[in-house]
Amino acid sequence: MKRREFGALAAGALAMGLPFRAFADETCQSPYMPKITGQEEFVYVWTLGVEGMGDEQDKLVTIDLRPGSATRGQVINSVSVGGRNEAHHGGFSADRRFFWTGGLDTNRIFIFDVHSDPSNPKLHKTIDTFVKDSGGVVGPHTFFALPGSMMITGLSNDDDHGGRTALVEYNDDGEYVATYWMPTADDMQGAVAVGDAVADGYGYDIRALIRKNVMLTSSFTGWSNYMMDFGQMLQDAEAMKRFGNTIVQWDLHTRQPKKVFNVPGAPLEIRFPWGSNANYAFSTTALTSQLWLIYEDDAGEWQAKAVADIGNPADIPLPVDISIAADDQTLWINSFMDGKTRLFDISDPHKPFQIYEKVIDRQVNMVSQSWDGKRVYFSSSLLANWDKKGKDDAQYLKAYNWDGKELVEDFAVDFYELGLGRAHIMRFGSSALYSS
Amino acid sequence: MRKRFLLSGLTLVAAATVVGWQVWSPVPPARPSPMSLVFEASDAYQFDPPAPGSYRLNRIKRAPDGRVLDIAGTEHSLHDLTRGKISLVSFVYLTCGDVNGCPLAMSVFFDVHDASGDLPGLNEDVQLLTISFDPARDTVEAIEAFAYPITSDEQAGDKLNWQVLTTSGPQELRPILDGYGQVVDRSEDQETISHLLRLFLVDRQGDIRNVYGLGFLDPRLLLTDIETLLMEEAGA
């Protein structure tokens, strides 16, 4: 048998851990899990239960997106998980057969089977021992798939309920593997603080660029803040000091921290681009409203710098979720307080600039786009105690068509009207992903 | 006097024998450290591997047991085959044509197998296992033919032992795939099989210590992990 030579791989495929990253996942049948380059069939919405509304429970809601379907734009299924857990984020397993989701208050992890019937996910397994397994980590936030395991970021700890936290790794069977505490000034674990950086030990998101063996984590705030009423927290000067100001660069293979960057104002979501030579990532800061670039310099060292303002930082629009296009040319950035989405041209990542904006609703958080960028979806909830109140507490999923110039609404699902709850993270599903 | 002469003579012969042994006995050539130096970096992996032993490899889960058949058709317990050596385990089907699939897994194994010729003594500690997940077509005869380039390699004795295995059917195969977490999906036409490319590093005690997928198949990383396990065993 002849050995074959292989050139560059599409290693960036697994870099971001976003659902449609799985497209270029390895396969002996091209592709095992085809990327949803065409039409996404379903969107799963991890939804927070609301006291006094419907069954009052957190739930995974499925909305039909199939063109021509009689139920297009409608909720076709819902799986309630019992209780209100502060449902927040989730991520697919590397084989995209399961969707792991977390509760930031109860620390329960709910794993849904999305492959047996993609139109009707089922609760497969619940992990109730996250805090005990991990040695005191609280707030399972981001679920980032690696081959054979799931890397979960924490937000807090059960010692002081502040922001000091860790990464926690489970295997694909849902068994605990290891905990990696974030570096702190007292225990840098071999990492180097760059410039004015002070390692605060906080966490939030995690993303990786496998080709470079680089993993990045960001920093938010702990349980005592994210479960506090938003208005009350804003008035609490001590609480307002307890936000993260760091992004940490890790060695992906060894899970060891290497550098701590000073990124003031709570950097949240991290996104790596798709290009095979694109050695950088974006993040946005919630409190200081800046777009940051974490990039490899000419000497091969990673650096971090602010590259643009988002809206008027003095207004504190509070940037939240972001979504990078498949061609790396544009970046949607949502801001919670003004309910806006803004589109940035990032064709030169060092000099991004805004090219479009639109008010989606009174509040907005998450944004997900189709592979071709022509369909963009928004959802509303940030945190149960931070969402706006009264008539400003709009809870929805809204679908838009984007033609490169204008977002035009396609359909909207009112989650309160349907008695479902607060709509949070969205992830796409498709029966085309699974052969059997 | 004769006795003393005899004794002296014997002593001289013994000394000469010792010296001769030192001159004629082959001194094993040194193994490069880190072992990953036997590979050059590729464009696909733009980083330096970590220093072996500078990190720990988690125990991810227990590698499953199962009944497998070797190229002679002899049945073995998978645990019996993996116990006692550090094993790199891959799953393929031999009629796979996707360049980013099974051929890639095989190519990485060929690279490691070939390079092991420059890593003297590694074959005492490390082995390769390739298991087919298509028992219907990958019969004992088929895997024997597939393994021919490996078994007929004149330098096979210096390289890692590489076993190509199959199973007698889906009933024997399923617990192995499920236990490893190797996802395999047959299309309706049954001709094409989709699977996620995965390599597994199993330690001597039978625990899976790392799982590699597309994007992680840097042979330098594989060797670095193997060297890290060896150092762990040595108490370094």
Curated annotation (Swiss-Prot), chain A:
**Where does the secretion signal sit in this chain?**
1-24
Q: What's a Pfam family this protein contains?
A: SBP56
Q: Does the keyword Signal apply?
A: yes
Task: Give the induction annotation.
Answer: Induced by methanethiol, dimethylsulfoniopropionate (DMSP) and methylmercaptopropionic acid (MMPA).
List, in alphabetical order, the Gene Ontology terms for molecular function in this entry: methanethiol oxidase activity; selenium binding
Pathway(s) the chain acts in: Organosulfur degradation
State whether keyword Methyltransferase applies. no
Q: Which EC number(s) does the record attach to this protein?
A: 1.8.3.4
InterPro entries assigned to the protein according to its UniProt record, in alphabetical order: Quino_amine_DH_bsu, Se-bd
Family per UniProt?
A: Belongs to the selenium-binding protein family.
Name of the protein in question: Methanethiol oxidase
